[in-house]
Amino acid sequence: MHDIKAIRDNPTAFDAAYTRRGLSPIADSLIKLDETRRIAILASEQAQARRNAASKEIGEAKKAKDNARAEVLMAEVAELKTTMPALEAAVKDADEALKTALSEIPNLPLADVPEGADEHGNVERHHFGAKRSYTFTPKAHDDLGEALGMMDFEAAAKLSGARFVVLKNGLARLERAIGQFFLDVHTGEHGYTEVNPPLLVKDDAMFGTAQLPKFRDDQFAAGAIGSGGEGYWLIPTAEVSLTNLVRESILDEKELPMRLTALTPCFRAEAGAAGRDTRGMIRQHQFTKVELVSITTPEKSKDEHERMLSCAEEVLRRLGLHYRVMTLCTGDMGFASQKTYDIEVWMPGQGEGGAYREISSCSVCGDFQARRMDARSRGPDGKPRFVHTLNGSGTAVGRALIAVIENYQQEDGSIAVPDVLLPYMGGLKVIAAA
């Protein structure tokens, strides 16, 4: 959410940043909505003030035995009492119109974000390792998993339809091992506090992190709990639960940065992904992810962004996976983001000759989410101000599983277990068909 006062004070600067996303200028229309709201507030306040004044004058007129004057004033108060609900409704409508407009406007990119229309405008920042070489043609993870008898899409389709999978035996254990490994590194070495949050959240939580209202069709609505209860949503990412832990609160800046992590299932309708990545586990309605969230001050958010990226990279380095880090351009970055780094891991079984696929996005959101959540902090001067929020995948466990399967595949179709995962595998070093 943006600050309408800042937009009014400098509409040119707002539009200059906003149009870098490839969008048309919008400041004037927002200012007009705000002007309508201000006029409505003024009319309501003037009516209330006049009603209060007239009520006082009635008493004075009666005291002076000026009955004619008192009757005129009582008629005026009665009329104001009749018209004021409409004035108050106009204020409510104008408030809602401005809030709705502001809630559907994306965050502004930072000045150092590269300009571009889509993913082709993203810029490689650096990479780690090199593509593995094979003496055989690498297979896709779904071909390998099905041949092992440990990845069953047909069974999942009977249960839930398309874009689900049933993992069994060694691959089920491998996925669990990856998630546990990620959590252990982030909590034991990177200073994140592990949280086990609810998977069902209310409208306010989804609004706070900006999934609602704009991306309603991409979410899974769980319906109401109990008769007449409020609706719930399945979380698309633990970012929603973790970030909203500070909603409607004022934090002590001595406690910041606050770093939180969670390993959860995530649920996405993928309404805009029809026909894309229909094979395998790349794009699922349900998947597991380790999320990283940081709450910090404006002065520290840039450094915290770099730190979060390094934490996400570290677990992939230890898995021995080749990846590249991309700075997303203005046309490809997320709705709530000021700046995003994507980590793209190399998957040799994807497409013809392999492909890079996103495994993590690390974003700094500034005070965009904090304004929606009313999340603030209080510094040495005692004045509350909005915090800055950051989120990142640390990383997507399902896609990490794909990367391990495809990169560690052997010619006979078995999967070698990376060394760092051996402590979690109960002595299993190679995943092979029974």
UniProtKB/Swiss-Prot annotation:
The gene is serS. GO terms for cellular component: cytoplasm. Belongs to the class-II aminoacyl-tRNA synthetase family. Type-1 seryl-tRNA synthetase subfamily. It catalyses: tRNA(Ser) + L-serine + ATP = L-seryl-tRNA(Ser) + AMP + diphosphate + H(+); tRNA(Sec) + L-serine + ATP = L-seryl-tRNA(Sec) + AMP + diphosphate + H(+). Pfam families: Seryl_tRNA_N, tRNA-synt_2b. GO terms for molecular function: ATP binding; serine-tRNA ligase activity. InterPro entries: aa-tRNA-synt_IIb (IPR002314), aa-tRNA-synth_II (IPR006195), aa-tRNA-synth_II/BPL/LPL (IPR045864), Ser-tRNA-ligase_type_1 (IPR002317), Ser-tRNA-synth_1_N (IPR015866), SerRS_1_N_sf (IPR042103), SerRS_core (IPR033729), tRNA-bd_arm (IPR010978). Its EC number is 6.1.1.11. Catalyzes the attachment of serine to tRNA(Ser). Is also able to aminoacylate tRNA(Sec) with serine, to form the misacylated tRNA L-seryl-tRNA(Sec), which will be further converted into selenocysteinyl-tRNA(Sec). It comes from Rhodopseudomonas palustris (strain BisB5). Homodimer. The tRNA molecule binds across the dimer. This is Serine--tRNA ligase.
